[in-house]
Curated annotation (Swiss-Prot):
GO BP annotation list: translation
Keywords attached to this entry: Ribonucleoprotein, Ribosomal protein, RNA-binding, rRNA-binding
Species of the source: Beijerinckia indica subsp. indica (strain ATCC 9039 / DSM 1715 / NCIMB 8712)
Function: This protein binds specifically to 23S rRNA; its binding is stimulated by other ribosomal proteins, e.g. L4, L17, and L20. It is important during the early stages of 50S assembly. It makes multiple contacts with different domains of the 23S rRNA in the assembled 50S subunit and ribosome.
GO-annotated cellular components: cytosolic large ribosomal subunit
Signal peptide: none
Source taxonomy: Bacteria, Pseudomonadati, Pseudomonadota, Alphaproteobacteria, Hyphomicrobiales
Protein name as annotated: Large ribosomal subunit protein uL22
Domain of life: Bacteria
Amino acid sequence: MSKEKTPRSLGDNEAKAVARMLRVSPQKLNLVAQLIRGKKVDKALADLEFSRKRIAYDVKKTLESAIANAENNHSLDVDDLIVAEAFVGKAMVMKRFSPRARGRSGRIEKPFAHLTIVVREVTAVAAGA
């Protein structure tokens, strides 16, 4: 017997995309995630396009993936999508050593982060209310 399928954790009007192991600290990634949270997807894509942060490119790719998931997998209207959630999680931290003076060593930490973006379709009635 196969394992029972877990119920869908998102609503019928939602879709999500996840980017894992992004080579950036969660604090820096969260700055870009805050930039798009709650906005319409076309405005969020424009903001990411002109952001000067290095990680904005990866966030934009993840948002485009969430939009494609909404359109192709869940048949949602792209024009009515907003970024419902954009949250960041901590991943592993690579530890490296840097040689220092007089035979000592310094520790360098290279953090990684996960990014989850959830887009939601809102109707004109719900947006106006």
